[in-house]
Amino acid sequence: MRPWPKAALFQLAEEGFTSTFEQLLACIISIRTYDEVTLPVSRKLFARARTPAAVKALSWEELDSLISPSTFHERKANQIMAIAGQVVERFGDTLPGDRDMLLSFAGVGPKCANLVLGVAHGTPVISVDVHVHRVTNRWAYVNASTPEKTLLALETKLPERHWIDINRLLVPFGKHICTGTKPRCSTCPVLEMCQQVGVTEHR
């Protein structure tokens, strides 16, 4: 999906923000927040602090100010500060790429943990957000009522070599072509294979 901007975590990885900790913080910042906000906010934070120790050394007020354009920034500041402290206490200044470890942090769910592991470590995992869920069901590639069920269906059906790429490709595709309402079917490059499940109006 080259014509459209990359999803935020993949773009940040291209810019050199590839550590587990950096990707995790960017993922937390991205929750309920547009990529157009996530990217500059993450860059601003990382210009000030990129490691657990550096983030832990920030005051809560400074951290909150750095991420304030993000939705629910006060809650996220609490989560990020707590995670930084736990990482420093348990691991020093490097967060391991372990799924169970990521899921143990408050506010980190399977979607975020999988995305971080896929981008930061190349771990074969699938991250299903609203775009991946919508597009794969609209295609009728899977038939699932929730993102969680879509994840299980994709893990069964999708070849493992595509597990990381499905998020990288379908997030921008879902944002710019296969949108939630009135998808741009007239300019869709894969219209011929799409079953258009649930589509009542399109452009």
Question: What residue spans do the PLM features occupy?
Answer:
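N-terminal polyanion-binding entry modules of DNA glycosylases/AP lyases
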Residues: 1-97, 161-162, 169-203
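Catalytic DNA-binding helix-loop module of base-excision-repair DNA glycosylases/AP lyases
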Residues: 23-29, 80-86, 95-140, 150-153, ...
